[in-house]
Structure formats: C-alpha cells, structure tokens
C-alpha cells in the first residue's frame, strides 16, 4: 500500500526535497518551495521480498537473451543504433532545434509501417495537420499502419497505444507530456521522469513488447535538457548533430545497452528529408587536380567506420594587432596549439598571419590523428606550394613536434590503399610495409622532417 509523506516542491522548476529552504537548490529561485503531501510508492524491503522469488545464480549458467531487432530501410540509422531497433527497448533522440529530429522519426515511421509494423506517432508539440503536411512532403504515399495522436496527456497516449496495439511508439517530445496522478506542472523533472517510466513499463511488458523512441530537448550547451536520470532510464541515447547552415547530419549513439556506443550514421538534410550518405568519400573529398595550395587529406575514425577528411587552409597577411584564428571544424584552442608547434618546431612564422581552416562537408574534427594533415595544409598555404592529391597524412603531433602513432593505423592504411591513394606520411610504428603493395608508406620522426620532404621540390 502506498504511504503518504510530506515534501517540499519548487513551483518554478518542480524540484522536490524533504526539508524546506528559502532558496531552491535546483533553479536558484527564492520563496518557491511549497509544502505538499505525496505518495511514496516504494514499499519496505520486507514487502518487496514477498512479491517475487529470486536468488543468486552462477554467472556461467545464465542464459543469454537474443534481442529481436527491427530493421529499417535506413542502413545508417540501423548502424548507429547497433544493427536495428530492439523490440522491447526505449531510446531517446536529442538534437538542437532544426536539426531534423521530427523529420527523421517520421521517415522511420513510414519505413517500419511499410514492413507491416503498427506505428503510433504521439506528438505533444505539433497538431495532426502539421504532421500530415510534413508527411505529404517527405514521405509521399502514407502507409495505413501509421497512427497519429496529438496530445500532452500520457494517460491518453497509453490508452491509445494499447487500443491500437502499436508495435513501435514515437513520442515527440518527452518533456511535453504529463500524468494526471502527479500535481507537478507539465515539463517539470517529476513529470518528465514519471512519463519516461511509463514508457519503460509499456515497452517491457511481457504480454506485448514494444519499441519506444522518445525525443528529448537539447539545451544551449549541447546536452540533453533535464535530469541525468532520464538518460539512465533509457536503453539507447542517440544524438543528431549538425549545424543549420550545413547539410551534414551525424547520428551518434552515446549509450547503447544492446550494442557498441559511438557508432555513427551519416545523413544529408535535403528538401525531401534526410538522405543517407552511402559513399562518404564522394561527399567529403573534393575532386580536383593537384596544384592547389592549402589542402591536405587524412582519415578519421567515427565509431567503427573510417572517414576520409579533407582539410582546407588559408593563410593571409594580417594588418591588425591580433591575427585571426578561425576554425569552424576545430576547437580554437587546438588550432592555436598546432600553430604554435608549427612556429617553434618547423620554423613556419605565423605570428602576423591570419589562419583559417575548414574540413570539407562540414565534418567536425574529433581525432588527434588529423593533426598532421591540418599542419601540412597550413604550411602548404603559407609556402604557396601544393600537396599531391594522392598523398595522405595520419599522425598526432606532440608539443615537441614529434609524430606519434595513432590507433588502428593498419586498418586506416588498408582503407586508403583501397581508395587509391599512393603515399602516406605517418609516425614511427611497427608495421610491415610489404603488406601495402600500392601504397608508399613514409615513416617520419617530426613535423619539420615531413614539411621538408613534402615541399622539397
């Protein structure tokens, strides 16, 4: 039986604590904590022990459950989520406004529905006519297996989900829903967590297993808004990353109980919706002849896949006291560090030069293995000497200018050889060069040695 207990709730943010205070510790507002009586659903450990029987077992005797995965028509989505949507799983998708969360989920709804799954799309932010207008634009022919419900009531959503016997449920977004049994305002931490708990219960019901995908808002710092508890509740956390001015969208799993984390799916935002990038090389690498300064190529690891990345740099004379350092694809601190190494270890004087770098396709530089390519592209622009477009650079560069080896260098070199590159500059490492018949591998000690070799002609 549920017990009653006294608590104090912030009427501004919904924070609950056992003792009164003048200031809410969560939102910082004064005089907002009010006393209320709430139900304590937790029972004593003695009562819990009567509800079910359980005992410790030997680990080697535990049987593995086989996850039933639901494949979509989007290989990039299935890759990011670990091979397909697990039937009794709860996933949350977060992204900045305008990144394409609702578009992606509507496209997935159509894909699953065409394969015979009953899909319930519950929106707490848009009307049914708004969803229909977008569906007509990006889906075209709408399957009879897609159900739409526009409501903020989790109680009503539960009724309709059960009535329509939905296999896959999409909630857009979880922060807009509420349960009638709680007095907290819509969007408060309590309502959000309890609505998420309701989704978990519906998904993992033994009588009818369902897959849930919830949308979660993202705050200004690029993290999912709300309590961390929400991330702990769900099985999978997906982040759709991309700037509104760029077409590129990266779908990354930051948590996955049913597969590897860090897997990445690549999409391009077009007028007809999100389009899979099937061949990343064509998307990220510009087709050009040798003879253009300021360009260098490397390979970067995103999840389990290797992506070619082209770095473009522009070095120009500055007539201001403080030269510009601009790097949309790279953190400014990292760019300044690499410029300092170039100046001190390679004799490339950039103290009065503007330096601008960019990765083609809008790809963000997340790996140190691209350091060498960035520095070579800057040197190429400064020296007004081009780099051969069949040459690649893979190495982390230390503060001493020394080239350091990068993880999985063998697989990177194999991929580059497959793509038709002829020469690769890397740090000193123990590899058998005979394994690469069509790729010349040049092991170098430091950045000065690389610059001397590349631009000696």
Regions picked out by a protein language model, each given a short descriptive name:
Residues 2-5, 9-12, 16-79, 86-94, ...:
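Peripheral, non-AAA+ core regions of ATP-driven protein-machinery
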Residues 119-123:
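Conserved RecA-like ASCE P-loop NTPase motor core of nucleic-acid helicases/translocases
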Residues 124-130:
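Conserved Walker A/P-loop ATP-binding site and its immediately adjacent core
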């Amino acid at each position: 039986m549920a017990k009653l207990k006294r608590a104090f709730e912030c009427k501004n943010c919904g924070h609950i604590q056992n003792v009164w205070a003048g200031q809410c510790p969560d939102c910082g507002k004064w005089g907002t904590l009010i006393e209320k009586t709430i139900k304590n659903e937790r029972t004593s450990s003695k009562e819990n022990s009567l509800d079910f029987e359980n005992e410790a077992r030997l680990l080697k005797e535990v049987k593995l459950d086989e996850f039933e995965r639901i494949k979509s028509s989007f290989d990039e989505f299935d890759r990011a989520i670990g091979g397909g949507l697990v039937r009794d799983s709860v996933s949350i998708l977060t992204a900045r406004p305008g990144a394409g969360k609702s578009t992606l989920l509507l496209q997935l709804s159509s894909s699953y529905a065409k394969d015979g799954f009953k899909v319930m799309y519950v929106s707490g932010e848009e009307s049914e006519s708004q969803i229909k207008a977008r569906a007509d634009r990006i889906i075209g022919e709408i399957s009879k297996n897609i159900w739409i419900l526009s409501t903020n009531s989790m109680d009503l959503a539960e009724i309709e989900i059960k009535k329509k016997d939905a296999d896959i449920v999409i909630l857009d977004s979880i922060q807009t829903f509420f349960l009638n049994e709680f007095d907290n305002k819509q969007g408060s931490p309590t309502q959000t967590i309890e609505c998420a708990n309701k989704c978990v219960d519906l998904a993992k019901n033994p009588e009818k297993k369902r897959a849930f995908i919830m949308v979660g808002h993202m705050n200004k710092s690029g993290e999912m808004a709300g309590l961390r508890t929400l991330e702990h509740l769900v099985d999978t956390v997906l982040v759709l990353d991309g700037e509104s001015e760029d077409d590129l969208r990266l779908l990354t799993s930051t948590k996955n109980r049913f597969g590897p984390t860090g897997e990445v799916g690549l999409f391009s935002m077009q007028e007809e919706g999100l389009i899979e990038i099937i061949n990343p090389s064509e998307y990220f690498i510009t087709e050009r002849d040798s003879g253009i300064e300021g360009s260098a190529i490397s390979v970067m690891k995103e999840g389990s896949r290797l992506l070619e990345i082209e770095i473009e740099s522009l070095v120009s004379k500055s007539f201001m006291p403080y030269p510009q350092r601009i790097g949309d694809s790279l953190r400014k601190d990292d760019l300044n560090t690499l410029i300092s190494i170039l100046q001190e270890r390679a004799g490339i004087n950039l103290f009065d030069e503007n330096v601008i770098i960019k990765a083609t396709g809008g790809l963000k530089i997340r790996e140190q293995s691209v350091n060498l390519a960035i520095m070579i592209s800057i040197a190429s622009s400064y020296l007004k000497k081009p780099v051969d477009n069949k040459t690649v650079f893979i190495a982390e560069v230390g503060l001493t200018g020394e080239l350091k080896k990068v993880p999985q260098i063998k697989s990177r070199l194999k991929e580059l050889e497959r793509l038709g590159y002829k020469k690769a500059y890397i740090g000193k490492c123990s590899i058998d060069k005979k394994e690469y018949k069509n790729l010349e591998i040049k092991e170098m000690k430091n950045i000065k040695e690389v610059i001397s070799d590349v631009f000696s002609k």
